[in-house]
Amino acid sequence: LIAATLVAAMGVSLLTGCGVSNKSHDNTQVGTTENSSDKAKNKEVKMHVWCSKDDVDITTQMIESFKEANKGTDFNIIIEESEDSDARNNILSNVHNGADVFPIADDQITSMVAGGALYEIEDVDAVKKADDEGAVEAATIDGKLYGYPLTADNGYFMYYNKNYFSDSDVATLDGMLDIAGANGKYLTMDWSSGWYLYSFFGNTGLDFGVNDDGVTNHCNWNAIITDIKGVDIAQAMLDIAAKPGFKNCVQDDFIAGVQDGSIIAGVSGCWNAAKIKELWGDDYGAVKLPTYTCAGQQIQMSSFKGYKYMAVNAY
C-alpha cells in the first residue's frame, strides 16, 4: 500500500511537469497517504525504486518530497538505475526480487498482467479525473488499471540537422538519404527493433494487433492479396539499406554519431531531444516521419502513440 501511495504521488508530480494531463490537479488528491502513513509510523518502510538514468534526479526529488509529506515514518528507499525498456524482462524473470516501484511502457503491461506481476491501482476514479483518457485506457485491462500515467510521448519522429536539410528536403526519405550520402554523412534508424520497423507497415493496409485474449497477437505482414504486399515493403527496405547515406544503428550509436558529426538525421523519440538540441544548437530540427518509396508509391511512414507509467510490483 505504501508503494502504491508513493507511485500515486510520483505520477501526479511527473504529470504536472511533463504535461501529460489535460486536466487541472489543483484540487485532486491521488493516493492520499494519511492512512498508510499512520500505520507505518515508527516502523522502517523499505522500498526499492527503479528509474532510468536520465530520471534519477527528478525521482530523487519526488521521493524526498514524499518523505517530507509523511514525516513520522522511517523510509528506507533505494533508487537504482534501470532502463524502462528492460522492466518487463527484469521483473518477470525475478519478480520477488524486482523493484517495488518501476516505470514501464504501455506495450509491456499486457504480458506483465498475464504474469501476475502488476499491482492493481485502487484509486481509479481519481486517476481518470486527473489524467489523459487515452493514457488511462492503454493501462486498463478487463476494467482494471495497472499503472499511473507519466508521459504521453512514447513515440518516434525524425531529427535532422538544418545545416544540411531544408524544410522541403525532409518530406521524403529518398531525398534525405540522397543528401546524407552526397555529404558523406548518415541518416540512421534502428532496424533491430520491431517497434521502429512498424513505421514501414503502418500505412500500407497490412495489419497487426493484440487478440481478444490480451496476450497473443495477429499479423498479416506477409500478405500477398493486399495492394501493398509484405514483399514490397521488404524490397523497399533493401533499397533503403543499399543507399550510401543510410546506417542501421541502435540509439546509443545514433547519439554517438550526432556527437562526432557523422550522423545528420535519425529516427528517435523525445528522450533524446535535449541531448541533440545541445549538440546541434540552432541547426536542431525535428519533424514527423517522411514518406518512403514502396511499390512505386510514396507511403507515409507511421509512428506509435505511446505512454509510460509508474507501476507497482504485485509481490
Language-model segments: residues:
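Glycine-centered hinge/linker elements that transmit conformational signals in sensory
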Residues: 216-250
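Conserved N-terminal structural module of periplasmic/extracytoplasmic solute-binding proteins
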Residues: 3-4, 12, 16-108, 287, ...
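Extracytoplasmic/periplasmic substrate-recognition and gating elements
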Residues: 76, 278-315
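Extracytoplasmic/periplasmic solute-binding protein
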Residues: 146-150, 156, 177-222, 263
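Hinge/lid segment of periplasmic solute-binding proteins
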Residues: 106-156, 168, 174, 285-289
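Short helix-initiation/N-cap motifs at beta->coil->alpha
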Residues: 80-90, 107, 247-260, 271
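A structural signal for short loop-to-beta-strand junctions that line the ligand-binding cleft
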Residues: 92-93, 97-100, 128-160, 185-189, ...
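A ligand-binding cleft/hinge motif common to bilobed small-molecule-binding domains
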Residues: 108-113, 270-283
